[in-house]
Amino acid sequence: RYDFRFNQLTSQVECRERNSFNFYFLPVDKRLMASITMNAQYEGLKLWDKDVVRFLNSDHVPVYQPIEEFLYDLPRWNGKDYIGNLAKRVPCDHPYWTQLFRRWFLSMVAHWRGMGKNHANSTSPILIGPQAYRKSTFCRLILPPCLQAYYTDSIDFSRKRDAELYLNRFLLINMDAVSYTHLTLPTTSRV
């Protein structure tokens, strides 16, 4: 009756009802778990909530890796510079912006895949410009629609535990509306 999967990125079990108009997987919360248990009992299965919990926390639930699924479903690269074209959407007079953005982007994807665990991605693009200049819109464009659930622009670094959870939960964090008045960058470095 249900399809289950363990989302490795969010560390949550997700499910969807088979033969339903709802094609999307939803996180299994207490209410949904109670519904699953009740539906099973209505169908004659003799089980308790703890039995459902035990099943959902077992290796009987397949692992889902959203990043790997997306990357492996991409068509073979046709030689077109998609990353460079994305970088060129940002009006910038820095001569190396496109190459630096590409390096950051490839490093970001490599870290998603768990490559280079001994090294952090030590660079981050900083987009500086007037309000309503579509900086956040550009950041949202970096992730494809199927991975938008792993993007956020609301993070509170004052609570260390929350910040650490966000850093593990999201693929891309846009630190929007952060004051960079303490930075003194040359004009050509501003984007």
Where are these regions (language model features)?
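N-terminal nucleic-acid engagement/recognition segments and initiation subdomains in replication
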Residues: 1-88, 92-99
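P-loop NTPase catalytic core of nucleic-acid-dependent motor ATPases
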Residues: 55-172
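Walker B catalytic acidic pair
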Residues: 176-177
